[in-house]
Curated annotation (Swiss-Prot):
Protein name listed in UniProt: Tyrosine--tRNA ligase
Compartmental location: Cytoplasm
Enzyme class: ligase
S4 RNA-binding domain: residues covered: 346-413
Cytoplasm as UniProt keyword: yes
Motif ('HIGH' region): 38-47
Function: Catalyzes the attachment of tyrosine to tRNA(Tyr) in a two-step reaction: tyrosine is first activated by ATP to form Tyr-AMP and then transferred to the acceptor end of tRNA(Tyr).
Residues holding ATP: K228
Subunit structure: Homodimer.
Species this protein is from: Mesoplasma florum (strain ATCC 33453 / NBRC 100688 / NCTC 11704 / L1) (Acholeplasma florum)
Length: 413
């Protein structure tokens, strides 16, 4: 498989420094790397493009390396950021780095991992200036779009040095791990070319085999940034975003975005995606593309077992059969429903309003009279009934159901 052709039909080629070197690296079975800075204790769906692309290179015969930025994470990448990042403590970076590496090991276990703190952490300022800084011209750095966009608003020396540190990462992996290719999002082009240029300077332009590759940033058809919801980021950690919510995020994607996402984020073939698109055009109400997208990505990130839970829970929410779920699925359901805490002396009508199942007491009464509200599958008939009078589940919890498909969760203090 020609890796460039594979990525081209998927629409994943943004920029390549040198196609010939990239294909030579593939034929030689050289290493490729992608960096992940530990800015949080979990990656989110915005990182999936790079995780999946790294896995594509692995499947194409490269030795894939995931580089955890335990060193560069102490500084923060300024590329196209409006403001300087808040510096993290050493303890925060170590904690985040460990969490992210463990997460990636679960998702892409065949990939090798490294941490740049292993070589940057022991480098003195004198060593950095002598071995790295002397090979970078200030005017060269100022011409980088990723740096130029920050000059007018202010850029510290700390962040200014980031691209040189990343260049040294590539050089270190090139020399010690036969890593000939760095991949990243299109916002990383400046940092990646700093690396290929630095390697060329160190080993000689006639000898270098380094190449850089970027993929486009994923945006939705309406122009909005991909990966955000009203409640915030969609995380790859099931403790931060439940598997059900993760699955639903993909189920709810717009028709106009699905083909692109299937190409970008799954390993389905062109023929399989074309067939899905044709089926969708015949019967769009079945949402075949969305269901396949959700299944493929949830399986990739969380595995078959968790995917099956998400599908069963989706069916249970649709049929209104929540309380008959087994304990594991009921726990997942509870994690996936918006929750508020209320005192046991709260009345039913106040609880309905507080949980946002109704906008007012008048509307709540209308729902009660229409038998449209239930607490743990028992229709509410008395608006003055106290929460203390209701049989709870799972440590003082009450599942509030409005109509057939709207759920809320009350936890009695």
């Amino acid at each position: 498989m020609n890796i460039i052709k594979e990525l081209e039909w998927r629409g994943l080629v943004k920029q390549i420094t040198n196609e010939e070197r990239l294909l030579k690296a593939q034929n030689d079975g050289a290493a490729v790397y992608c960096g992940f800075d530990p800015t949080a204790d979990s990656l989110h769906v915005g990182h999936l493009m790079m995780i999946v692309t790294l896995k594509r290179f692995d499947k194409a015969g490269f030795q894939a390396i995931g580089l955890i930025g335990g060193g560069t994470g102490m500084i923060g990448d300024p590329s196209f950021k409006a403001d300087e990042r808040k510096l993290q403590t050493d303890e925060q970076v170590k904690f985040h780095a460990t969490a992210i590496q463990n997460q990636l090991l679960r998702i892409i276990p065949d990939v090798t991992f490294a941490n740049n703190v292993d070589w940057l952490g022991n480098m003195s300022l004198i060593d950095f200036l002598r071995d790295v800084g002397k090979d970078f011209n200030i005017s060269y750095l100022l011409n980088k779009d990723s740096i130029a966009t920050r000059i007018s608003t202010g850029l510290s020396v700390t962040e200014f040095s980031y691209t040189m540190l990343q260049a040294y990462d590539f050089y270190n992996l090139y020399i010690n791990h036969n890593c000939k290719v760095q991949i990243g999002g299109s916002d990383q082009w400046g940092n990646i070319t700093s690396g290929t240029d630095y390697i060329s300077t160190r080993v000689g332009s006639a000898n270098t085999e380094a190449a850089g590759f970027t993929i486009p940033l994923l945006t939705k058809s309406d122009g909005q940034k991909f990966g955000k919801t009203e409640s915030g980021a969609v995380w790859l950690d099931s403790n931060k975003t439940s598997v059900y919510d993760f699955y639903q995020f993909w189920i709810n994607q717009d028709d106009n975005d699905c083909v692109k996402m299937l190409k970008y984020l799954t390993f389905l073939t062109k023929e399989e995606i074309d067939e899905l698109e044709a089926k969708h055009k015949e019967a769009p109400h079945l949402r075949t593309m969305q269901k396949t997208l959700a299944s493929e990505i949830t399986k990739f990130v969380h595995g078959d077992k968790e995917l099956n839970k998400a599908i069963k829970l989706t069916d249970a929410f649709f049929t209104g059969n929540i309380l008959n779920l087994d304990d594991d699925l009921l726990e997942l359901a509870i994690k996936s429903i918006p929750t508020i805490q209320l005192e046991k002396t709260t009345s039913a009508i106040d609880a309905i309003v507080n949980v946002n199942a109704a906008s007012s007491k008048r509307e709540a009464r209308e729902f009660i009279n229409a038998k449209a509200i239930s607490f743990n599958d028992v229709a509410v008939q008395d608006e003055n009934m106290l929460l203390s009078e209701i049989k709870t589940i799972k440590n003082n919890k009450i599942i509030v159901k409005k109509g057939k498909k709207k759920y809320y969760l009350l936890e009695i203090k």
